[in-house]
């Protein structure tokens, strides 16, 4: 920088220094602040840090391990947490999370737990709890917060799989830190005044069925996007709380939680039309959270009549074709679908149904498998159903087919 080491740098007015900072990236702001003490004082001017994107956790990488990132996180949140308007926190996965599972003839079988991997996961969990406490603690009194986005890791930060309840008990005895995290979120929501975007996906122990009740009336009236995705058994969004969100235009939740009652509420004439609906269907959870009571064909018709521009995104994880055919109603305005599975086959009948019912709305189709035996096309077929799907869906712009080949 031309002014580096010059007396002139200290003589510049604060307004001009802040204006210079406004043209720099976050990293360049930090470098420029080393010019002198006066520039460092201007570094934390609120208008310069309206948005903060943080990625923490995971294994060792060029940016350090998850625990090594904690002091940096504390520094940023201590200086910006009280006034930042948009905060995005992403927890990255630990390396090697797939090793506890092994595919056997199209099935997933548990193998012996790796002690070293388990230790890494426990360390990641401890770090996760500390970092989430830090973030929520620093924004608890932020009344200007407009966007809060928390994204965890589906494979690690869940009280299931390789991290069972006994492991979690060792990390957080009595659930003290989890309870503290939940209380901090309640304070964040109750103190908020302008939240327009609230999203929490796969964040262990952060959101409870009672969390939305603490949302202030001001934020309830301004909220436009709500995303609550988790594998918890109780529904995180109740009709009573959803009724308060009259300006909601985008909603993301578990497919099993999108009940007929919620659909009727969203189709009401005293609220803003819904533009985007994202639904996650987890096949492994269907036994505990059945599809009974989810939106029917008539419910979808009423919702689309009220929200003419509604588009739906469905992510199906390890869902059998029978359950897929059950939820893919004709009136569902499907725009994007992501089929990701390790132990179930995507049948040609499912592909044909999608191609026929959603030929005028489907724009994104993603098919991911962990073996080479998909889709199940049968033996007497001349037409490839994937080719027919691409041909029939006139607005299809993204087609992704991913196969993980394994050596025999």
PLM feature spans:
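The conserved beta-strand core of Leucine-Rich Repeat
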Residues: 1-408
